[in-house]
Amino acid sequence: AAQAAAPAVALYYGKELPHTDFRAFDIVVIEPDHAPAAAAPALPDTRFYAYVSVTEVLPSRAYYRDIPDTWKLARNQDWQSEVIDQSQPEWPAFFAERVVAPLWQRGYRGFFLDTLDSYRLATTFDEQAQQQGLVRVIEALHQRFPGIQLIFNRGFELVPQLPGKVAMVAAESLYRSWNAKTQRYEEVPEQDRQWLLGQLRDIQQRDGLPVLVIDYVAPHDRALTRA
């Protein structure tokens, strides 16, 4: 398949959106709990996408208290979040109605889907059942919200199962990573980098989708940021 043209994308999870910094971007991914609206008059040509965690839920989210304990598969100790069992039959509808629908009502039409592989944090899990559950989640979103645009953060194995339902695939830490446990920026090992490059090439060449790479650099390290 021919590779689609890649839009310019920025990710910003801060509370104060510096509009002038984002005029060069087609898409800005933001934390919707920090932003009152899905559009900014100062940026008429920029689309705002909402960051949404799929398999992990923080206790601070409004819908957290309504998630049954039986749906909780594991805990991410680094971020203090609960990992949700994607094989639960009622989860796709819950995710669509409780997580995405309120954001859709606020005007968001694009979503950055994070934590698509966090089920692997569990001690035991059925890989196929978890992936099938995630496919049902994505299909539920397209059925419930016609025209929805989705950027995957990883989820490489899911993309071939969802033709026409993914707009772009992102991946963190091609060259540099952030270690939440040690609170340090680290260089990615060459073996991991080559594996990730292979995944991204497949997405571009096999699926014809644009890719987005997110690397982590200390804010004061301007030279490395520009490298």
Where do the protein language model's features map onto the residues?
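Glycan-processing catalytic domains of CAZymes
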Residues: 2-227
